[in-house]
Every structure is written in structure tokens, then in C-alpha cells.
Amino acid sequence: MKLKTILCAALLLVAGQAAAQEKSITIATEGGYAPWNFSGPGGKLDGFEIDLANALCEKMKAKCQIVAQNWDGIMPSLTGKKYDAIMAAMSVTPKRQEVIGFSIPYAAGINGFAVMGDSKLAEMPGLGETYSLDSQADAAKKAIADISSFLNGTTVGVQGSTTASTFLDKYFKGSVDIKEYKSVEEHNLDLTSGRLDAVLANATVLAAAIEKPEMKGAKLVGPLFSGGEFGVVAVGLRKEDTALKADFDAAIKAASEDGTIKTLSLKWFKVDVTPQ
């Protein structure tokens, strides 16, 4: 009887330790930035970052909950401890680094313009080219100058408080009328309604949106841009959560090395966005 009691106690102790060691992480996403993250039928969250978050949580041996949060409040709610991490196509920028910390990158950011196919802007030069604002700075600046001249006097929509809005402010302010929106869906609607001449956003998001009936007639134009203001995409974290950062870093590194990020990239974007 004593041996049985001791064994039962030992099993309960081991089970208790295992439960205590299991991490519980709440991850916020925007839920309106397809195909990175979006709300599907019944409000279920889906997309590249939902799949990747689940894969990372499995590698971290963590129990994760993914919640939707409006973009405008996504960083304040993190610092206010409403959740533990952000996976919402958030690029790492110096301004954001003043407020929160970041994991190592899990995706590269590539951005471009979209217009309606019957617009004169559909002939924007540079289609098929991709310029890095870092390693191809001179070529990128020339391409930007060409586009700025081409777009002169037009109205361009962009989601506010994003790297895309920063890019427009830096390179196009004065030559175009910049109109900021709360979401990509909102500026896409104004594009198709004729209230905008062009929009700038993540190219993977625009490519997915253009395939939908509500964006019929829209097309990607001009070159794509990466690096610089667009940077890389990483998990947003509170600066003090160094242990959680280490866990995410290790999981992302493993997901990059074993091809998980590439597989999910090809599934959702048809291109590999694994950081190089």
C-alpha cells in the first residue's frame, strides 16, 4: 500500500511539473490583412501568420491563443499586457523599436502599387522589377523618381501607421496627395470606386486582393520595393520579456532551417518570403 501511494504521489508530481512547464501565450493579429491574417467563415482566424504561429507554438511546446486586435491599438494593447505577442505582418522599424521589442525576422517585406486596369497609371514603368532600398539604393531612388513623376498630381491610398505610409511620406510627399486609411480593405474599396488613383501596400496582400471579385479590374503596376522603410517582419514583444523572445527566436530559426516558413509562404503567397 505504501509503495502504491508513493508511486501515485510521484506520478502526480511529474504531471504537475509538466503542466507548470507548459507555457501559455496569447498572440494578437489584425485579422484583416489577407493572406497574412484574416477572419474566415464564422470569424475564424486564418492565413500565413495563423499557420506559422501554430507551428512556432508547437516548436516552443506552448499552449497558444490567437486573438484579433485592430491595428491602431495593437502596440498599446501589447504594452498594456492585453496579450503577449504580435504577429500581424508588422515590420521592424526604429520608431517601433522605441516602444516594443522584436524577435528575429520570420518574413521579408515586399511592397508595390496597384491601380485599376483602365487607368492611365496602368502603364507605370518598372513592372517585374524588385529594388532593395538597402543593397540597390541608387537604382531604387531612380525608380522612385520615375514613379513620382508618373504619379504627380494623383491621389494614393495607404494604410496609416505602416511602413508603406512612411515610404510614401518620405519619397512622394508633395508630388501626390496621400490619403491614409485604417485598413487595406478600406483603401481597396476606394480604389475600385474611383476615389483613389492608386494604392500602396504589401505586394502579397495586393496580389491576393486583386483575385477577389470586389477587386475586379485592378492590377499590380510598377516595380516592387523591399528593405529600407519596409524592413523585415518579426514578432512584436514587450522589451522586458527576454525569455519569451529567446523562445520565439529559437522557434523561428528552426522553422526557417527545416523549411516550415518556406512551405507556408508558398501555400499562402506563391513566393518564398523566408528572410535571407
Swiss-Prot record:
Induction: By octopine.
Disulfide-bond pairs as recorded: 57-64
Record flagged with keyword Transport: yes
Major location (coarse): periplasm
Coiled coil feature spans: none
Pfam families: SBP_bac_3 (PF00497)
GO molecular function: ligand-gated monoatomic ion channel activity
InterPro entries: Iontro_rcpt_C, Lys_Arg_Orn-bd, SBP_3_CS, Solute-binding_3/MltF_N
Cellular localization per UniProt: Periplasm
SMART domains: PBPb (SM00062), PBPe (SM00079)
GO cellular component: membrane; outer membrane-bounded periplasmic space
Sorted UniProt keywords: Disulfide bond, Periplasm, Plasmid, Signal, Transport
Signal peptide (from-to): 1-20
Function per UniProt: Component of the octopine active transport system probably consisting of four subunits: Q, M, P and T.
Similarity field: Belongs to the bacterial solute-binding protein 3 family.
Protein name: Octopine-binding periplasmic protein
